[in-house]
Design a protein with these regions (language model features):
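A short, Lys/Arg-rich alpha-helix, primarily the initiator
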Residues: 1-16, 23
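Key DNA-contacting residues within the recognition helix of helix-turn-helix
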Residues: 7, 32-33, 62
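Short, charged amphipathic recognition helices of the HTH superfamily
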Residues: 13-18, 43-46
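The DNA-contacting recognition helix of HTH DNA-binding domains
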Residues: 17, 28-29, 58
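Short alpha-helical "recognition helix" segments of helix-turn-helix
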Residues: 19-21, 50
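Recognition helix of helix-turn-helix/homeodomain-like DNA-binding domains
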Residues: 26-41
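DNA major-groove recognition helix of helix-turn-helix/homeodomain DNA-binding modules
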Residues: 45-60
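Short amphipathic recognition helices of helix-turn-helix/homeodomain-type DNA-binding modules
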Residues: 61-68
């Protein structure tokens, strides 16, 4: 996962971890764990919501969530 790219997109949209966590309906701690790949991953539905919130292209989604 490319957490730097996700964080930069969040910043461009003025979102904090709390803003995105609230939008996804998860706790801020859960979001941090997912971003830091600390034992949990983003679910497909969460990725879809992030794509919609930030108007991401399919390539951007691939770069953020599926990059090694």
């Amino acid at each position: 996962m490319n957490k730097a790219m996700l964080r930069s997109i969040m910043t461009l949209h003025g979102d904090t971890n709390k803003d995105l966590a609230d939008y996804l309906g998860i706790s801020e701690q859960s979001l941090c764990n997912k971003i830091n790949e600390n034992g949990t991953e983003f679910k497909q539905g969460e990725i879809k919501l992030i794509k919609i919130r930030y108007n991401l292209t399919a390539d951007q989604v691939d770069l953020i969530f599926f990059a090694e």
